[in-house]
Amino acid sequence: MTPWPSQREFSKRAFELNQTRRHLEHHPGTNPPSFTAVVEEVTEEGGVILSESWCYPRGGGQPGDTGTFMIDGKSIAFGEVTAAQSITHPLLGSGLANGDEVTCVIDRDRRNSLAKMHSAAHIVSAVANERWGAITVGNQLNTESSRMDLKFENRELFDKDQLTEDANYWVHEDVAINVHQWGRDQIMTDEGVRNKRFVERIIDRVGGDDPQLRMVEVEGIDLCPCAGTH
C-alpha cells in the first residue's frame, strides 16, 4: 500500500493545484449537487483543501458557500469557503485527515438566496446606469439584504422609488439569465457591455493571447463579466 505524502508534501501539492473554480461550470448556480472529493490537506488553521471543489469561494461581494462533509455516516460542518491559490473549507468540527474521501453537501438554501441576490444586484446596477449614468463601484451581498455602492454623475437626479419600480419590473418579467464565454473582440464590440474601460482592465489582468471571460447576461438589461452564481 502506497503511503500518503507527508504534511509538507501535501502543502506543496495543494499550492500547486491552482484549483479550477468548478462552480463556474454549473449554470444555473442554484440547487448545487453534492460532490465527492479527497482531502488533500487539513491546514494548521483547520481549513480543508480538497482534490477539487464545486463550492463558491467568497469573492466579488458574494459570500462563499457553507455546508457539510459526510464521511463514514457522520457529518462535519464547514464555514464560509474562501480561495487564493486553492479553495479552503474552514472546518467547524474535527475528524478529517489527509487522504479521506468525503461527500460535500453545499447549503442549498444559502446558495440559492445568494444567487438570486446576485442576479438582483446586476439588475439594480444596470437600471441605475441606464437611468442616471451611475457606475457600481462596490457591493456586499447577503442572504437577507445587500448593499450597492453607486457613483452618480449627478446625485440630485437619483430617484429611489424609480429605481425600485424599474428593478421590480425586470424581476417580475422573469427574464432569462445566460452565461457566455467570450473573447476580447466580442466583448469590446458588443453594445450591451457597459463600462468598457473597466472591462478591458479585467481582460488585461486575466492575460493571454485571447482570454475567454465568463459573461453573464440578464436578457434585455445587463451583460457583464461575472464569476458569481445566478
Report each predicted region and the residues it spans.
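Active-/binding-site microenvironments in catalytic and ligand-binding cores
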Residues: 2-230
